[in-house]
Protein backbone atom coordinates (compact mmCIF):
# COMPACT_ATOMS: atom_id res chain seq x y z
CA UNK A 1 0.00 0.00 0.00
CA UNK A 2 1.27 3.47 -0.89
CA UNK A 3 2.10 5.89 1.91
CA UNK A 4 -0.46 8.35 0.53
CA UNK A 5 -3.15 5.69 0.96
CA UNK A 6 -1.94 4.97 4.49
CA UNK A 7 -2.19 8.67 5.35
CA UNK A 8 -5.75 8.70 4.06
CA UNK A 9 -6.64 5.67 6.19
CA UNK A 10 -5.23 7.38 9.27
CA UNK A 11 -8.03 9.95 9.02
CA UNK A 12 -10.74 7.27 9.16
CA UNK A 13 -12.47 5.85 12.20
CA UNK A 14 -11.74 2.20 13.18
CA UNK A 15 -15.07 1.15 11.62
CA UNK A 16 -14.22 2.85 8.30
CA UNK A 17 -10.73 1.34 8.30
CA UNK A 18 -12.15 -2.13 8.89
CA UNK A 19 -14.70 -1.74 6.07
CA UNK A 20 -12.03 -0.37 3.71
CA UNK A 21 -9.68 -3.28 4.37
CA UNK A 22 -12.48 -5.82 3.92
CA UNK A 23 -13.39 -4.17 0.61
CA UNK A 24 -9.74 -4.37 -0.52
CA UNK A 25 -9.52 -8.03 0.45
CA UNK A 26 -12.63 -8.98 -1.51
CA UNK A 27 -11.17 -7.80 -4.82
CA UNK A 28 -8.51 -10.49 -5.07
CA UNK A 29 -7.54 -13.76 -3.41
CA UNK A 30 -4.04 -12.30 -3.16
CA UNK A 31 -5.42 -9.67 -0.79
CA UNK A 32 -7.39 -12.04 1.41
CA UNK A 33 -7.06 -10.90 5.01
CA UNK A 34 -7.52 -12.63 8.33
CA UNK A 35 -10.26 -10.82 10.21
CA UNK A 36 -10.31 -11.61 13.93
CA UNK A 37 -12.03 -8.38 14.93
CA UNK A 38 -15.55 -9.77 14.87
CA UNK A 39 -17.65 -12.36 16.65
CA UNK A 40 -17.28 -14.94 13.89
CA UNK A 41 -13.79 -14.71 12.32
CA UNK A 42 -13.38 -15.66 8.67
CA UNK A 43 -10.74 -18.30 9.50
CA UNK A 44 -9.95 -21.21 11.78
CA UNK A 45 -6.62 -22.45 13.11
CA UNK A 46 -6.20 -25.86 11.48
CA UNK A 47 -3.16 -27.23 13.37
CA UNK A 48 -4.80 -27.56 16.80
CA UNK A 49 -7.95 -28.99 15.24
CA UNK A 50 -5.94 -31.64 13.41
CA UNK A 51 -4.26 -32.53 16.71
CA UNK A 52 -7.62 -32.56 18.48
CA UNK A 53 -9.08 -35.11 16.08
CA UNK A 54 -5.95 -37.29 16.25
CA UNK A 55 -6.22 -37.23 20.04
CA UNK A 56 -9.82 -38.35 19.68
CA UNK A 57 -8.74 -41.35 17.61
CA UNK A 58 -6.20 -42.35 20.26
CA UNK A 59 -8.81 -41.96 22.98
CA UNK A 60 -11.19 -44.24 21.10
CA UNK A 61 -8.46 -46.86 20.72
CA UNK A 62 -7.92 -46.71 24.48
CA UNK A 63 -11.63 -47.01 25.16
CA UNK A 64 -12.11 -49.97 22.81
CA UNK A 65 -9.12 -51.84 24.20
CA UNK A 66 -10.60 -51.78 27.71
CA UNK A 67 -14.13 -52.86 26.82
CA UNK A 68 -13.95 -55.31 23.96
CA UNK A 69 -16.91 -57.51 24.85
CA UNK A 70 -19.59 -55.44 23.14
CA UNK A 71 -19.50 -54.18 19.58
CA UNK A 72 -19.91 -50.43 19.33
CA UNK A 73 -19.10 -49.83 23.00
CA UNK A 74 -15.97 -48.70 24.76
CA UNK A 75 -14.77 -48.56 28.33
CA UNK A 76 -12.98 -46.15 30.60
CA UNK A 77 -9.33 -45.29 30.06
CA UNK A 78 -6.56 -46.85 32.15
CA UNK A 79 -3.99 -44.38 33.44
CA UNK A 80 -1.08 -46.76 33.99
CA UNK A 81 1.43 -46.47 31.10
CA UNK A 82 -1.06 -44.49 29.00
CA UNK A 83 1.63 -42.00 27.96
CA UNK A 84 3.72 -44.87 26.58
CA UNK A 85 0.77 -46.09 24.52
CA UNK A 86 0.17 -42.50 23.39
CA UNK A 87 3.74 -42.18 22.10
CA UNK A 88 3.44 -45.55 20.36
CA UNK A 89 0.25 -44.30 18.68
CA UNK A 90 2.06 -41.15 17.57
CA UNK A 91 4.95 -43.17 16.17
CA UNK A 92 2.52 -45.39 14.25
CA UNK A 93 0.71 -42.43 12.70
CA UNK A 94 3.60 -39.97 12.54
CA UNK A 95 2.82 -39.06 8.93
CA UNK A 96 -0.73 -37.95 9.79
CA UNK A 97 -1.58 -34.25 10.12
CA UNK A 98 -1.74 -33.16 13.74
CA UNK A 99 0.36 -35.94 15.25
CA UNK A 100 3.58 -33.93 15.43
CA UNK A 101 1.66 -31.11 17.11
CA UNK A 102 0.47 -33.59 19.76
CA UNK A 103 4.00 -34.88 20.39
CA UNK A 104 5.41 -31.37 20.75
CA UNK A 105 2.58 -30.29 23.06
CA UNK A 106 3.07 -33.34 25.27
CA UNK A 107 6.84 -32.87 25.46
CA UNK A 108 6.57 -29.15 26.14
CA UNK A 109 4.13 -29.56 29.03
CA UNK A 110 5.92 -32.46 30.69
CA UNK A 111 9.35 -30.83 30.32
CA UNK A 112 8.47 -27.23 31.17
CA UNK A 113 6.05 -27.85 34.03
CA UNK A 114 7.24 -31.22 35.37
CA UNK A 115 3.82 -32.79 34.78
CA UNK A 116 3.43 -36.56 35.06
CA UNK A 117 2.95 -37.87 31.52
CA UNK A 118 0.42 -40.57 32.43
CA UNK A 119 -1.70 -38.11 34.42
CA UNK A 120 -1.66 -35.58 31.57
CA UNK A 121 -2.63 -38.00 28.79
CA UNK A 122 -5.26 -39.63 30.99
CA UNK A 123 -6.86 -36.22 31.55
CA UNK A 124 -6.80 -35.55 27.81
CA UNK A 125 -8.37 -38.92 27.01
CA UNK A 126 -11.10 -38.67 29.65
CA UNK A 127 -11.81 -35.11 28.59
CA UNK A 128 -12.13 -35.75 24.87
CA UNK A 129 -14.26 -38.85 25.43
CA UNK A 130 -16.56 -36.87 27.72
CA UNK A 131 -17.27 -39.99 29.77
CA UNK A 132 -16.98 -38.48 33.24
CA UNK A 133 -17.89 -35.51 35.35
CA UNK A 134 -14.88 -33.16 35.32
CA UNK A 135 -12.81 -32.86 38.49
CA UNK A 136 -12.53 -30.12 39.53
CA UNK A 137 -15.80 -29.17 37.90
CA UNK A 138 -14.74 -25.58 37.09
CA UNK A 139 -11.79 -26.70 34.90
CA UNK A 140 -9.58 -29.75 34.50
CA UNK A 141 -6.30 -29.63 36.44
CA UNK A 142 -3.77 -29.62 33.61
CA UNK A 143 -6.02 -27.68 31.25
CA UNK A 144 -6.10 -24.93 33.87
CA UNK A 145 -2.32 -25.01 34.25
CA UNK A 146 -1.77 -24.64 30.51
CA UNK A 147 -4.43 -21.94 30.10
CA UNK A 148 -3.06 -20.00 33.08
CA UNK A 149 0.47 -20.01 31.66
CA UNK A 150 -0.86 -18.80 28.33
CA UNK A 151 -2.87 -16.00 29.94
CA UNK A 152 0.12 -14.93 32.02
CA UNK A 153 2.26 -14.83 28.88
CA UNK A 154 -0.23 -12.91 26.75
CA UNK A 155 -1.81 -10.59 29.29
CA UNK A 156 1.18 -9.75 31.47
CA UNK A 157 3.80 -9.63 28.73
CA UNK A 158 7.04 -8.26 30.16
CA UNK A 159 5.30 -6.90 33.25
CA UNK A 160 5.70 -8.70 36.60
CA UNK A 161 2.85 -11.05 37.44
CA UNK A 162 0.40 -10.04 40.18
CA UNK A 163 1.08 -11.55 43.59
CA UNK A 164 -0.86 -14.67 44.47
CA UNK A 165 -2.64 -17.25 42.37
CA UNK A 166 -5.85 -16.91 40.41
CA UNK A 167 -8.31 -19.65 39.52
CA UNK A 168 -9.76 -20.18 36.05
CA UNK A 169 -13.33 -21.16 35.20
CA UNK A 170 -13.84 -22.61 31.73
CA UNK A 171 -17.17 -21.60 30.19
CA UNK A 172 -18.86 -21.84 26.80
CA UNK A 173 -17.79 -18.41 25.63
CA UNK A 174 -17.65 -14.71 26.43
CA UNK A 175 -21.40 -14.11 26.57
CA UNK A 176 -21.92 -17.15 28.79
CA UNK A 177 -19.22 -15.80 31.10
CA UNK A 178 -21.14 -12.53 31.33
CA UNK A 179 -24.31 -14.37 32.36
CA UNK A 180 -22.48 -16.33 35.06
CA UNK A 181 -20.80 -13.18 36.38
CA UNK A 182 -24.04 -11.21 36.56
CA UNK A 183 -25.74 -14.14 38.30
CA UNK A 184 -22.85 -14.56 40.74
CA UNK A 185 -22.79 -10.88 41.65
CA UNK A 186 -26.55 -10.98 42.23
CA UNK A 187 -26.59 -14.27 44.18
CA UNK A 188 -23.84 -13.05 46.51
CA UNK A 189 -25.63 -9.72 47.05
CA UNK A 190 -22.69 -7.81 45.61
CA UNK A 191 -25.09 -6.15 43.19
CA UNK A 192 -28.75 -5.68 44.03
CA UNK A 193 -31.73 -4.34 42.06
CA UNK A 194 -31.53 -0.58 41.92
CA UNK A 195 -27.75 -0.44 42.25
CA UNK A 196 -25.74 1.60 39.77
CA UNK A 197 -22.96 0.24 37.58
CA UNK A 198 -20.65 2.06 35.17
CA UNK A 199 -20.10 0.73 31.65
CA UNK A 200 -17.23 1.71 29.37
CA UNK A 201 -18.92 2.76 26.13
CA UNK A 202 -19.21 2.08 23.27
CA UNK A 203 -19.39 -1.56 24.28
CA UNK A 204 -20.54 -5.05 23.27
CA UNK A 205 -24.35 -4.82 23.14
CA UNK A 206 -25.22 -7.45 25.83
CA UNK A 207 -23.45 -5.30 28.44
CA UNK A 208 -26.03 -2.61 27.69
CA UNK A 209 -29.01 -4.95 27.59
CA UNK A 210 -28.38 -7.33 30.49
CA UNK A 211 -28.45 -4.80 33.37
CA UNK A 212 -31.91 -3.72 32.23
CA UNK A 213 -33.37 -7.22 32.52
CA UNK A 214 -35.88 -7.74 35.31
CA UNK A 215 -33.54 -10.30 36.91
CA UNK A 216 -30.97 -7.57 37.61
CA UNK A 217 -32.75 -4.19 37.30
CA UNK A 218 -29.51 -2.21 37.51
CA UNK A 219 -29.01 1.45 36.69
CA UNK A 220 -26.26 2.32 34.20
CA UNK A 221 -23.79 5.17 33.92
CA UNK A 222 -21.83 5.30 30.66
CA UNK A 223 -18.12 6.06 30.79
CA UNK A 224 -17.78 7.26 27.21
CA UNK A 225 -14.56 6.91 25.24
CA UNK A 226 -13.71 9.77 22.91
CA UNK A 227 -13.32 8.92 19.23
CA UNK A 228 -11.38 12.14 18.66
CA UNK A 229 -8.82 10.94 21.23
CA UNK A 230 -8.31 7.54 19.59
CA UNK A 231 -11.06 6.00 21.74
CA UNK A 232 -9.37 6.78 25.05
CA UNK A 233 -11.45 7.70 28.12
CA UNK A 234 -11.24 11.38 29.09
CA UNK A 235 -10.53 12.33 32.69
CA UNK A 236 -13.97 13.93 32.89
CA UNK A 237 -15.56 10.54 32.23
CA UNK A 238 -13.34 8.66 34.68
CA UNK A 239 -14.40 11.15 37.35
CA UNK A 240 -17.81 9.47 37.33
CA UNK A 241 -16.19 6.44 38.99
CA UNK A 242 -15.51 8.47 42.12
CA UNK A 243 -19.24 8.52 42.85
CA UNK A 244 -19.73 6.08 45.78
CA UNK A 245 -23.12 5.05 44.39
CA UNK A 246 -21.34 3.38 41.45
CA UNK A 247 -20.82 -0.20 42.62
CA UNK A 248 -18.99 -1.68 39.62
CA UNK A 249 -17.21 -0.72 36.40
CA UNK A 250 -17.60 -3.04 33.38
CA UNK A 251 -15.00 -2.53 30.67
CA UNK A 252 -14.00 -4.28 27.41
CA UNK A 253 -10.31 -3.89 26.53
CA UNK A 254 -9.38 -3.86 23.67
CA UNK A 255 -12.75 -2.31 23.01
CA UNK A 256 -15.65 -3.80 21.11
CA UNK A 257 -16.71 -2.49 18.61
CA UNK A 258 -13.96 0.14 18.31
CA UNK A 259 -11.15 -2.49 18.46
CA UNK A 260 -8.76 -0.14 20.28
CA UNK A 261 -6.79 -0.89 23.46
CA UNK A 262 -6.68 1.55 26.33
CA UNK A 263 -3.38 3.38 26.61
CA UNK A 264 -1.12 2.72 29.57
CA UNK A 265 -1.88 6.25 30.76
CA UNK A 266 -5.62 5.52 30.84
CA UNK A 267 -5.06 2.20 32.60
CA UNK A 268 -2.95 3.88 35.28
CA UNK A 269 -5.73 6.40 35.85
CA UNK A 270 -8.24 3.57 36.30
CA UNK A 271 -5.82 1.94 38.75
CA UNK A 272 -5.68 5.19 40.71
CA UNK A 273 -9.48 5.17 40.96
CA UNK A 274 -9.38 1.57 42.17
CA UNK A 275 -6.84 2.49 44.85
CA UNK A 276 -9.03 5.35 46.04
CA UNK A 277 -12.13 3.15 45.94
CA UNK A 278 -11.32 -0.39 47.10
CA UNK A 279 -15.09 -1.02 47.25
CA UNK A 280 -15.43 -0.57 43.47
CA UNK A 281 -15.77 -3.85 41.54
CA UNK A 282 -13.73 -3.83 38.32
CA UNK A 283 -14.77 -6.31 35.64
CA UNK A 284 -12.68 -6.39 32.47
CA UNK A 285 -13.57 -8.34 29.36
CA UNK A 286 -10.24 -9.06 27.65
CA UNK A 287 -11.48 -11.35 24.90
CA UNK A 288 -9.29 -9.51 22.37
CA UNK A 289 -6.41 -9.10 24.80
CA UNK A 290 -4.03 -11.26 22.77
CA UNK A 291 -4.27 -8.76 19.89
CA UNK A 292 -3.31 -5.76 22.05
Feature-to-residue mapping (PLM):
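Conserved N-terminal helix/loop that builds the PLP phosphate-binding region
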Residues: 1-104
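Conserved core of the PLP fold type I
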Residues: 72-279, 289-291
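Walker B catalytic acidic pair
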Residues: 285-286
Amino acid sequence: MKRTDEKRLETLSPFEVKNTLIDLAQHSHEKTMINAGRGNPNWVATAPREAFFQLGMFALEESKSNFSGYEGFGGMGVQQDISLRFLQFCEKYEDQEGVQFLIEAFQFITDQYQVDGDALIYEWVEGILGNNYPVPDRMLKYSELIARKYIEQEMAGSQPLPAGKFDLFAVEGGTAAMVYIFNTLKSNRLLNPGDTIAIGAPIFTPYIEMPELEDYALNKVEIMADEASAWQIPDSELEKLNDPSVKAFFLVNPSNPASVRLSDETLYKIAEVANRRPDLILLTDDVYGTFA
